[in-house]
Amino acid sequence: MTQSREVLNLLTLQTPSPSGGPRPCRRYQLRTPREGCGTVMEMMVAQRDHLRVSHVSPFAVSLQAPDRWERCRHGAPRFRLALGKGEYGRVEAVSKHECVKTFNEVVAFYHELVVCDLIEIARLRSRCPEKSEGLISFVDACMPCKQLFFPRYSCSLNDFSHWGPENIPPLVAGFESLLDAVVFLNEECGLFHSDISPCNILVERAQTETGLGKLVLTDMGLATPHTGNPQTGVSFVSSGGTQLYQMFVDRGPFMVSKDAYKPACVLLRCFRVAAALNWGEVKTDRFPICQQMSRVIDVSCLGYCLLNVIERILDVTKAEPTNRFYSRCSFTELQPQYFLKCLVHKVVLLEFLADLWKVEGGGLSIGVSSGAEFDSERLSLSERQDFRSWCRQLDTRYICTLYPYSNLLEGCEGLRDCLVNLLSLDYFSPFGRKSLES
């Protein structure tokens, strides 16, 4: 295989079909709701307030907005409480139970609006809508104001700080629900989230001040259709038929997930491509992601979010050893070593947990050891030496700050099993553990 062909394969986030060619598009049929979900007439009435198909071609579909979105119906709120802001715009509480997300750019607004409503339509048609409880509900939209309305939550998982033993059982239950949500997003919505991190997981208010409430996946601003859909091209049109937005669907490994939560299979692709090409060439080649790779990446990102929480449980002194380790990193995304270094905290902490919990059979192995043994990749001597040195440096930090509190995790079989399950698809090979089966 030529180098250019190999790089193209790495940039294409698709698993090979049994024949070796591209995977065919999978076609879904609308399923009637399960008993107890209402009659077909009720479903049709409910769908009146959602997107509808206005045009279909072999490769694309046009989705039309309902009339209600195009009218401003909400009025001025009685109060506004700022909850967050970013490049997209701002989020404000407008009541005790509701918040509004106001966008600066119409493109970002249309994108998230379409994705959120596709999820709501999937709930309407699902036989198991309870599997979507870990996905944020979309309440309403106002196109003139570029606003989306959502339920209000207490904080993000990134900001939650009460990590006592009493919150470990609800943590496990929360991540099991998030796993159901990601599978629902993948199989029933036909969507790839692509940006799962603790910042994008919200915490519902619990019965006590320090309790951990229900966890919900949010921020669909980068979610896109995968190739399991009959059409991947999606355009959004007004109720009058005017095209408002053409959804982006092409994805590449460099623009998938925040680096701290990038799965090992994605980091390998980034490492190989960055070593073979210059950055300008890399950024131009992107392709739609297949359903299997979408699942591998989103589920694995959930696993690394849970790993982050486990570190915070152990970090009793708030030393933040991982953040401090990476704050001294001198590499940039232009260098392949950067992506190797993004593996270090995953490898070191997973090795420690595998030993602590007596995990057998490589259940927490991602194909890389802190001794710089790579199961499916040949590195140069200097690269292996650097990786081994980085692992020793971080392990030294953990010895001082995390490991003395390992008793907090003893007996946490549910937490162990949840982490093993979430990381069961990831491996330092192009397609995750699937590569090992080929």
Swiss-Prot record:
Domain Protein kinase: 77-340
SUPFAM superfamilies attached to this UniProt entry: Protein kinase-like (PK-like)
Lineage top rank: taxon: Viruses
Molecular function via GO: ATP binding; protein kinase activity
InterPro entries: Kinase-like_dom_sf (IPR011009), Prot_kinase_dom (IPR000719), Tyr_kinase_AS (IPR008266)
Record comment regarding domains: The protein kinase domain is predicted to be catalytically inactive.
Similarity field: Belongs to the protein kinase superfamily. Tyr protein kinase family.
Name of the protein: Probable inactive protein kinase 38
Lineage summary: Viruses, Duplodnaviria, Heunggongvirae, Peploviricota, Herviviricetes
